[in-house]
From Swiss-Prot:
Its main location: nucleus. It holds the Pfam family CLP1_N. Coiled coil: none annotated. Belongs to the Clp1 family. Clp1 subfamily. Residues 1-43 are annotated as: Disordered. This is Protein CLP1 homolog. Residues 1-15 have a biased composition (Polar residues). GO terms for cellular component: mRNA cleavage factor complex; nucleus. The lineage of its organism: Eukaryota, Amoebozoa, Evosea, Eumycetozoa, Dictyostelia. GO terms for molecular function: ATP binding; polynucleotide 5'-hydroxyl-kinase activity.
Amino acid sequence: MSNDNSVNINNFSSMNGGGGGSDIQFPLKPSQQQQQQQQNSINQSTIRTLEITQELRYEIDFDQNGWMKLIEGTAECFGTELSLNKVYKLSGTKGAVFTWTGCKIEITNNCQPYIGEKTPMPQYAGVYQELDAFRVSILDEPKKSGPRVIIVGPTDSGKSSLSKILLAYSARSGYQPLFVDLDPGQGSITIPGTISAAHIQNPLDIEEGLAGGIPLAHFYGHTSLDVNPDLFKALCKNLASFIDKQLDSSNISRISGFIANTCGWIDGLGYKILLQNIDVFKANLIIVMDNEKLYSDISSHYSQKDNSIKIIKLPKSGGVFIRPPVFRKKTRMNRIKEYFNGINDNLSPHYIVLDFKDVSIYRTGGGPAAPASALPIGTSSQIDPLQITEVYPSLDMCHSIFAISYAKQASNIFHSNVAGFLYVSDIDMETKKITVISPAPGPLPSRFLLLGTLKWMEN
């Protein structure tokens, strides 16, 4: 996916890597005894036999390392086929391996594996078949867009899992759908605090996750929508405009369409934001995960407004795990760590020292503000949520994440996507220098840096 401002921000030249503003800290390194106990656990594995349409569910902590291997039959993980006898390393993840044919899988015991017999995978596959049929039906109709899918539902209802499955099946069929991530609390494409989009040309990598093309991202700067909902809505409009241009850029893009994942805030203001995004992204298929009321509300809303939108309801898998706040925080920590250090610590981030005079730091909304949910009933913030305010470097910016804007001038910051991210390691007020960590060496693409409430601790 390219545009005039594209640059590979996986290492900036690349962007793939509860509450905004809280420090994210690494766990301490395990002791030698703990490492030995962990190694002993890794060496212990079992072989699980799955019958037709069963799935093997697993869950492993962030400080554990395990693996699994398909030794007989065929199986897939989030729509991606497993290779026979290939060892897949697992750490800090939860998932499931599904089989249409029956299979045998060897897996380490620290993955806490168990077999689930009831799975909605046949229903998920049925939805993909509908998408495929729709794509085929518009092959010779250049004015029609392919599937524009928005997946909605409460937290921990399986939205991300379904997104991966539909994207993987699409890529396996030769399509190149856009994956649109509208959940700033998760950061599936880049890092938390962003909304982004990327073309998906291959199924997800089982070890490394989604492997999209060069992403386009807007920096929201927070992990919760209620910190600045007006900014979030405005950035979504910007991203939707980009999506329209991308789908018009080639026939394969038009036919492939997009799959959009959303956050789990589905009531009150969160529901209104969902409806706005359905409209601005011009969705033609809404998938509601595991919530009767949300399905009823959306169906009622669009039955009076737009009968061209199809709305379906799907159950969540029994393998969908409830993610406690600690797990969510660790997941966000890990996404930022992977951006700078690589999936398996295979990247070497670079320290760069910047003079105060060489950068301009901007904060949206005119400065920190209380979340909308924290304001007294009937009142609203007096701060313009879309105001761009330049701020002087200060010590409280240490451990913050800066986004590097592509804007050529300050007035264009709001409408510009970002080139990558920096971690603020130190600020020296006497020498007027900022020490940052960058995923790549060399000069910054722009002097304009964006600041939100996102923080991270390097060690």
